[in-house]
Structures are given as structure tokens and as C-alpha cells.
Regions:
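CBM-like carbohydrate-recognition segments
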Residues: 22-141
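"A position-specific structural signal for the A-helix of alpha-solenoid helical repeats
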Residues: 10-13, 68
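Structured, solvent-exposed acidic/aromatic patches
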Residues: 1-10, 59-63
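Inter-helical turn/loop segments and adjacent helix faces that build the functional surface
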Residues: 14-19
Length: 141
């Protein structure tokens, strides 16, 4: 996932700098491949809907992927990748994976397990993704 996010973000930045279509095409191809590989259709009882969600690996890897999807969204306006992240984060927050006392999110954020200890790197990644989503919301995007 992070191995897709970083080159996708780089391709977007190169497109912004050069305007060369090949970089945008590359970013879009990486996005399609990453989405196909790292997202799964999920039926959420918490949200009452089906959506494509992150497969549930370590959040830091997905935060890097999310950066790439955000850069691409700024260029092509395709929101389905961002929406998948948005719903994935909402699912994690609304489910049993969130510790109701501390609001920390479990490493197992789609299977509903809670932890007795947490990793700073993991929690930081969640904060980053949630903050980036909040900025989009404030901007009306």
C-alpha cells in the first residue's frame, strides 16, 4: 500500500510541475491497481451500508497510500478513492475497534477487536488520515 502511495504522489507532483500527461496517466494507473489490491467490499452494520474499505493492514501503510489518493483527487476530482478512506475511518471510529475511554483505535480496525496497548505510529497515522479528511470537509470537498 505505501509502495503504491509514494509513487502515485510523486507522479502527481511531477504532473503538477511539468504538465506532462504521462505522469497523470501513471498516477491514475497506480490508483486503480492499488484500489483493486487493497480495498474490499464490506457490509457495515455500524454505517448501515456496503462500501469499499481498506483491507485492514497497519494504518501507517495506508496513510502513505492516502496521501497519493489525495494528490490525485486534487488533479482529477475523482472522489471514490477518498470516499473509501472516509468510510473506512468512519467505520473504525463507530465500531468496537475504538476504545470508548481513550478514543484510541485498534490495529484490528475492521474486525472489531480492541487492544490493551497501542502503537504511537499506528495512532499517528489515524490522526493524519482523519485530519486530512477534516480539511477536505472544511474546504467543502
Amino acid at each position: 500500500s505505501y509502495n503504491s502511495g509514494q509513487p502515485m504522489q510523486a507522479a502527481c507532483l511531477l504532473y503538477n510541475i511539468t504538465g506532462e500527461q504521462q505522469y497523470l496517466n501513471e498516477a491514475q494507473q497506480i490508483a486503480r491497481s492499488a484500489y483493486s489490491k487493497w480495498f474490499t467490499l464490506y457490509d457495515s452494520k455500524e454505517l448501515g451500508e456496503k462500501f469499499y474499505r481498506i483491507n485492514g493492514d497497519h494504518a501507517w501503510f495506508y496513510s502513505v497510500l492516502f496521501r497519493g489518493f489525495l494528490e490525485l483527487y486534487k488533479i482529477d476530482g475523482r472522489r471514490d478513492y477518498v470516499t473509501a478512506f472516509e468510510k473506512s475511518m468512519l467505520q473504525a471510529w463507530m465500531s468496537e475497534c475504538r476504545n470508548q475511554t481513550t478514543n484510541l483505535l485498534s490495529n484490528n480496525y475492521f474486525i472489531g477487536k480492541t487492544n490493551s496497548s497501542w502503537q504511537v505510529l499506528h495512532e499517528g497515522a489515524f490522526v493524519e488520515m482523519l485530519a486530512r479528511l477534516a480539511v477536505l470537509e472544511l474546504e467543502g470537498k
